[in-house]
Amino acid sequence: LQNLRDTLSQGMDNVRSSVHDLHDDALDLQVTLQRLLKDYSFCDGTLEYDVLHPLSQQTIYHILAIVKESMNNTMKHSNATKYSITVREQPAFYQLILRDNGTRHSSVPWQTRGIGLSNMQERVADMHGYLNITHTSGFQIYITLPKEDKP
């Protein structure tokens, strides 16, 4: 049990330090996501990134905060061994997919919106997007964000 606590603590520290400078004016989303996954020692992480046009710094900030919260939830509430981030650009929107392969070991039902999931929903709503959660073969968060007029 102590090993688990130490691992969780180390993982949380790594994630916190990786996003310490979220307010940097020149954040590169792909590089920052790669760094987050590299520092995410709790399980193996992968990134699929297919975005050609730049996102606004505010959108990048929101996406990074959502990813950080999702990673924290995976560490705290699942026994996942794999975690993936997919960011895709479509003609009218951006798509963010966050997945893990775990099964929940928390006593709280997945449908219960804790603070973390509620914060994600609020961020997505602030960007006029949509959030959908499924729990088949792990836990998946699907987010669709409309493109901004100006990045």
What would you call each of these model-derived segments?
Residues 46-58, 90-91, 99, 134-136:
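Conserved catalytic submotifs in the C-terminal HATPase_c
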Residues 1-44, 88, 95:
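DHp/HisKA dimerization-phosphotransfer hairpin of two-component histidine kinases
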Residues 25-62, 67, 71, 75, ...:
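Helix-loop-beta hinge of the Bergerat
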Residues 23, 78-83, 128, 135:
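A short, flexible helix-to-loop-to-beta junction within the catalytic ATP-binding CA
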Residues 73, 81-88:
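A conserved short beta-strand within the histidine kinase catalytic ATPase domain
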Residues 109-140:
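ATP phosphate-binding glycine-rich loop and adjacent ATP-lid/helix-beta elements
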Residues 87-89, 133, 143:
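Conserved catalytic core of two-component histidine kinases
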Residues 93, 103-104, 135-142:
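Glycine-rich nucleotide-binding loop
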